[in-house]
Amino acid sequence: MTSPSSSFWNTASREAMKSGMFVAKVYCFLHVTTNYLGFMAYAYGPSMIPTLHPSGNMLLAERISKRYQKPSRGDIVVIRSPENPNKTPIKRVVGVEGDCISFVIDPVKSDESQTIVVPKGHVFVQGDYTHNSRDSRNFGPVPYGLIQGRVLWRVWPFQDFGPLGPTPT
């Protein structure tokens, strides 16, 4: 015969085990989803005007295509900043490996331009609003390994919910 207290502890330990397994499954699902399939990205600031709002956007980005295909001109990508690895800016791909890119170095201060060839395994990224954007004009071409994902949809603000096309609007 089991005492009421041992029955309580048996039931409590079974429930704790069930809850722990549920939490572990949810954690594994979220880990696989965000590291291999897609993730939510937050973009704010003026560098992608008019495509994105400077006051903030929630975007859905996918990670699958970066494993199977190279980025294309016009794609909006989330990158790991070459200058500060804690930041993940969102920029548009304007040049792929082998492209010859001419750009104005600092459009606010001068008309001085520079031309570079994008090296193999790199992309040239730029904000849509070039007068206020830190991008490949500042830190050079970005290696494929720093691309975190490709932006597919704007989720917030709700009035602009929908897919983001490959070219500026």
From Swiss-Prot:
Stored NCBIfam families: sigpep_I_bact
Pfam families given in the database record: Peptidase_S26
Family: Belongs to the peptidase S26 family. IMP1 subfamily.
GO BP field: signal peptide processing
Active site feature: 47, 91
Subcellular localization, as worded in the UniProt entry: Mitochondrion inner membrane
Gene3D superfamilies: Umud Fragment, subunit A
One GO cellular component term: mitochondrion
Keywords (A to Z) from UniProt: Hydrolase, Membrane, Mitochondrion, Mitochondrion inner membrane
Record's protein name: Mitochondrial ATP-independent inner membrane protease subunit 1b
Protein source organism: Arabidopsis thaliana
Role of this protein: Catalyzes the removal of transit peptides required for the targeting of proteins from the mitochondrial matrix, across the inner membrane, into the inter-membrane space.
InterPro entries in the record: LexA/Signal_pep-like_sf, Mito_IMP1_subunit, Pept_S26A_signal_pept_1, Peptidase_S26
